[in-house]
Amino acid sequence: MLTVLSPAKRLAARPRLDLPRGLSPTSPRFQNEADELAAVARGLTAADLRRLMHISEPLARLNVARFAEFHEARTAAVPALALFDGDTYAGLEARTLDEDALRWAQDRVCILSGLYGLLRPLDLIQPHRLEMGTRLKTARGVSLYEFWGDRIALALNERATKTGARALINCASAEYFSAVDLEALSLPVISPVFLEEREGERRIVSFWAKRSRGAMARFIAENRLEHPEEILSFRAGGYAFEPDLSTDDRPVFLRTA
């Protein structure tokens, strides 16, 4: 199986990932496209970035500087797993994955990215903020969805062929998974849902759902799961599979608060 994750908005201040001997950082599949997008973003002002991504003035200025130095700062690139530091990656706990799990994840865990399209965990990337939902005008359209088109789906198909994967576990947000052209994708998609029950009401709690998506990716990598039904034994964070609420492509995991 392949597992897809969203990237993180929050980035590590001091990114670090100690790689076992024999494992080395890799280059992004769509580095040329990332360079193309960075060149477009380099022409934007802080006000433009604030408007496009609804971010603060300091964060907008920081990303103006990042895009201005994008090509020159290539030597500062670090593995994606080391840089991303949000709730999903707290659940993944990449720094404590053993060598076998990390090797497995490198081929089968796929990180969606507005700037880089599709990343492997050890792909070298630079600090940036470019959300997939951004309406950034390029020669290919008026949004990043139009820019990426079917290329992310086709890259996932290639990864599936290489690994023998026969299903895709969607642990990404709706914003990011919308960049996967389902008509071009050759894999069935299973999208786990994480619900919390409190005083008889069931709902998605964003913090715990994000963390659980990362924990699910870790569970799959640590146990080298190959079949969708195997994820139903996931128990991290107090969640348990709830068959009465589930369908084949939407397994629901429930916890009681």
UniProtKB/Swiss-Prot annotation:
Taxonomy, superkingdom: Bacteria
GO cellular component, one term: cytosol
One family name in Pfam for this protein: H2O2_YaaD
One of the protein's GO biological processes: response to hydroperoxide
InterPro entries documented for this protein: YaaA (IPR005583)
Stated family: Belongs to the UPF0246 family.
Name of this protein: UPF0246 protein Rsph17025_0016
Native source organism of the sequence: Cereibacter sphaeroides (strain ATCC 17025 / ATH 2.4.3)
Lineage: Bacteria, Pseudomonadati, Pseudomonadota, Alphaproteobacteria, Rhodobacterales
